[in-house]
């Protein structure tokens, strides 16, 4: 699947993002996803392959690698709880705002896309409720509240700061929802609980 990151530099008057919003990628990952989308369209158009094109916005949950935001913060909290790290969470940009979808909801969305969406077209998938947008700073604070270690400091570390930031990514998923009837069922609290518990178990079992 593609990614909401493909949109990159978005202005406030362009929110929420839709299928026709201009792409202004600001990192190599986003460019690679755009290339993937274009080549998939070529295979649909030229060779008749049954390809469903989607751009998925932030989805989180257990087993996501800790090079990403929420897993990285949860991983650090789990280490702090085990005494493996000082009570300081190291971060990059944390004022960027996103709305988050649980990976289980996203997997259901992918299945519905395959079953109900006409091939060749583009669909945005994600939680697009503007009342459920969180900055990464807010997410970290919610994770800290779930920890048995309360006096955890948040500290920006230059090595984790991207040279370019994407302040807000909010997608308009109306087209996809109308075709499939999909709605995300799992909220941010369960997303954070599931992610934090995964990393707690991981560290206990691996002495990481």
Predicted regions and their residues:
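Catalytic helix-loop patch of NAD(P)-dependent Rossmann-fold dehydrogenases
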Residues: 5-53, 58-60, 64-65
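A short C-terminal helix-loop "cap" of Rossmann-like NAD(P)-dependent dehydrogenase/epimerase domains
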Residues: 19-20, 47-50, 74-90, 116, ...
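Glycine/proline-rich active-site loop of Rossmann-fold NAD(P)-dependent oxidoreductases
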Residues: 34, 59-75, 82-87, 103-104, ...
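C-terminal "lid/loop" region of Rossmann-like NAD(P)-dependent oxidoreductases
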Residues: 88-93, 122-123, 137-140, 148-168
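Conserved C-terminal active-site "lid" loop/helix of NAD(P)H-dependent oxidoreductases
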Residues: 103, 122, 159-183, 187
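Non-catalytic, hydrophobic alpha-helical segments
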Residues: 106, 110, 125, 136-139, ...
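Amphipathic terminal alpha-helices
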Residues: 188-208
